[in-house]
């Protein structure tokens, strides 16, 4: 099989590494890279709350949240979702030279578990 790559109009690859279609197919259903850890700090949660105007107490009030059902403040689901570019650009498969990246869309996104302030996440 031939090699496949995504190129811009000028012929420059949009992604840093080329994978043959055979190698890419072999990775279906398997882990294709692990990102660097990302610290989910209260400061980051507060900044996200300010930008999005979502200042629910479960996100921004550590004292009240400590008494609540989750035992402390938790990150917004959309804060975690917004880290997808970070995860992509810091793993061994997608890291490298990108000319640009564009979000195409999402399907069936769910937030099954809360992420407490002070946690670390990665893909």
Placement of each model-derived feature along the sequence:
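Hydrophobic beta-strand-centered segment that forms part of the acyl-chain substrate-binding groove
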Residues: 69-72, 82-123
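Catalytic strand-loop segment that frames the active site of acyl-thioester-processing enzymes
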Residues: 4-75, 89
């Amino acid at each position: 099989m031939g090699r496949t790559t995504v190129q811009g109009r000028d012929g420059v690859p949009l992604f840093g590494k080329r994978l043959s279609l055979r190698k890419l197919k072999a990775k279906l259903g398997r882990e294709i890279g692990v990102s660097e850890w990302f610290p989910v700090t209260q400061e980051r949660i507060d900044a996200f709350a300010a930008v999005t105007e979502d200042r629910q107490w479960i996100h921004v009030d550590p004292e009240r949240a400590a008494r609540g059902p989750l035992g402390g403040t938790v990150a917004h689901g959309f804060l975690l979702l917004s880290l997808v570019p970070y995860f992509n650009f810091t793993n061994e498969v997608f890291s490298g030279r990108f000319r640009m990246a564009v979000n195409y869309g999402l399907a069936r996104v769910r937030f099954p578990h809360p992420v407490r302030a002070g946690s670390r996440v990665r893909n």
